Amino acid sequence: MTQNSDFPKNYIEGHQNWVEGLSEKESSLYQHLGREGQTPTIMVIACCDSRKMVPDMFNAGPGEFFVLRNIANLVPPQGHDNGIAAAVEFGVNAFKVQHIIVMGHAACG
């Protein structure tokens, strides 16, 4: 990991601790996902709230969910040229996701 003097040291150390703390099974899974790519069957369009960890809310592991975070979990009408439509198209056409969840909540932000 590249070190930047302005970047909070606790996050650099936290990442190092996370990598060192991976079990053999977890490490093998991440290596597999890195080599073979992801194959999520579910896409979630959620808000950008940093308090919400979408895969954790469903007890899902790495590579299981394709997550798009967007302000207010909005999905614009068809025909608008935007990154959200591109992400949905990618999820459906490239990953063949079978389900799309649009998830919002009160008191966001």
Label each residue range with its predicted role.
Residues G79-F95:
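Thiamine diphosphate
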Residues F65, V97-Q98:
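Short glycine-/polar-rich loops that comprise or flank the Walker A/P-loop
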Residues I100-G109:
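Active-site microenvironments of hydrolase-like enzyme catalytic domains
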Residues T2-N82:
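Short, conserved "active-site rim" segments that organize catalytic pockets and cofactor/ligand binding
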